């Protein structure tokens, strides 16, 4: 087994403490913002330029520019409340008047006329189309444009995201202050399966982090938000949240291995529940293979520590691949258990 990393990497513990310790100080900071009033129907003003993207792909996902529609697509939805917000868009929970089902509808914060910004939204739509349906991917259903705003109708994952789960673990009375390890392995199984599908389609996500890992109604973890991702042949210079960013992206080296690092540091956060650094010496240490774990903490197995070290290897050419990750002994046993449990559940549904 590989030795544990140099514990002196984080000699000053003042900046690297558990979220449970800092929870009271950060209470106001972590509180969800008040939900603003949502628009009833988006304006129907004509767009300046129709988006140039396929109107339909093999998965059946459609994109409609205003010139191709006879009425506002937004009028097909009842907007219930805002459930998320990013740099470029807000996400609403909405009920379709067509089928009565609930969806997530993402709306750009402002009309998108600037080319690079439009291209980023188009990229998210096209990659969603390319990925199609997968159990561990938040599916894109449809997209359209109104008044310069871009809308994306997606599968609703209303049980929150992994960041929410980590915060709840901190607040749990008498708990570990973090997720139990058996749960971490189950979540890793979901994420790894989804990421394998993403890479098989020739796409790099480039923004794997807890906020972009969403829980479906049945508790399955799904990868969402493909607004930053790039194709493996595209030579794009996109990069996501620097807290989870792979070190080689600083040198404009874009490979699927960057997603493995981001997943590895996400796994590290899940296992330790440390507040990860955004910059400075601690940030650099984590990207130089100096990965400290809490001392005298037997809640983190050696299997999990070893895997995190493999995933966060500073050399992207030596980092474990998604194929090898799925074959990792411990993860294989979890995958087998999940499959057998799922099969048993389906049989019970048929019989009873």
UniProtKB/Swiss-Prot annotation:
Give the Protein kinase domain ranges.
Answer: 77-331
What are the Basic and acidic residues biased-composition ranges? Answer: 10-34
Q: Where is this region: Disordered?
A: 1-57
Q: Where is the active site?
A: 207
Record's catalysed reaction(s) = L-seryl-[protein] + ATP = O-phospho-L-seryl-[protein] + ADP + H(+); L-threonyl-[protein] + ATP = O-phospho-L-threonyl-[protein] + ADP + H(+)
> Which Gene Ontology cellular-component terms appear in the entry?
cytoplasm; nucleus
Fetch the CDD domains from UniProt: PKc_Wee1_like
Give GO BP annotations, semicolon-separated.
DNA replication checkpoint signaling; negative regulation of G2/M transition of mitotic cell cycle; negative regulation of G2/MI transition of meiotic cell cycle
Claim: Transferase is one of the keywords in the record: yes
UniProt-recorded Gene Ontology molecular function terms:
ATP binding; metal ion binding; protein kinase activity; protein serine kinase activity; protein serine/threonine kinase activity; protein tyrosine kinase activity
Its recorded name reads: Probable protein kinase DDB_G0291842
């Amino acid at each position: 087994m590989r030795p544990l990393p140099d514990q002196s990497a984080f000699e000053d513990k003042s900046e690297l403490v558990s979220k449970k310790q800092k929870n009271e100080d950060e209470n106001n900071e972590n509180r969800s913002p008040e939900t603003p009033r949502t628009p009833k129907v988006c304006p129907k003003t004509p767009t300046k330029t129709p988006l140039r993207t396929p109107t339909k792909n093999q998965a059946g996902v459609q994109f409609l520019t205003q010139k191709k529609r006879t009425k506002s697509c937004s009028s097909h939805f009842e907007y219930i409340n805002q459930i998320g917000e990013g740099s470029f868009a807000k996400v609403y929970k909405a009920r379709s008047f067509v089928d009565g089902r609930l969806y997530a509808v993402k709306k750009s914060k402002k009309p998108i006329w600037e080319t690079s910004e439009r291209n980023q939204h188009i990229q998210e739509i096209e990659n969603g189309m390319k990925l199609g349906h997968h159990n561990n991917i938040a599916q894109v259903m449809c997209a359209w444009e109104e008044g310069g705003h871009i809308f994306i109708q997606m599968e609703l994952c209303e049980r929150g995201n992994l960041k929410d789960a980590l915060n709840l673990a901190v607040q749990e009375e008498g708990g570990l202050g973090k997720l139990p390890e058996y749960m971490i392995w189950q979540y890793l199984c979901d994420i790894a399966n989804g990421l394998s599908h993403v890479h098989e389609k020739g796409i790099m996500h480039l923004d794997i982090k807890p906020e972009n890992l969403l829980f479906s109604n049945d508790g399955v973890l799904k990868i969402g938000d493909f607004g930053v991702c790039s194709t493996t042949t595209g030579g794009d210079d996109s990069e996501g949240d620097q807290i989870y960013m792979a070190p080689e992206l600083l040198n404009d080296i874009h490979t699927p291995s960057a997603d493995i690092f981001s997943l590895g540091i996400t796994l590290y956060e899940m296992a330790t529940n440390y507040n990860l650094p955004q910059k400075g010496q601690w940030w650099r240490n984590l990207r130089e293979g100096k990965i400290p774990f809490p001392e005298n903490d037997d809640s983190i197995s050696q299997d999990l520590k070893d895997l995190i070290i493999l995933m966060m290897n500073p050399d992207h050419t030596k980092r474990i691949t998604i194929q090898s990750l799925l074959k990792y002994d411990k993860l294989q046993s979890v995958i087998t258990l999940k499959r057998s449990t799922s099969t048993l559940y389906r049989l019970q549904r048929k019989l009873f």
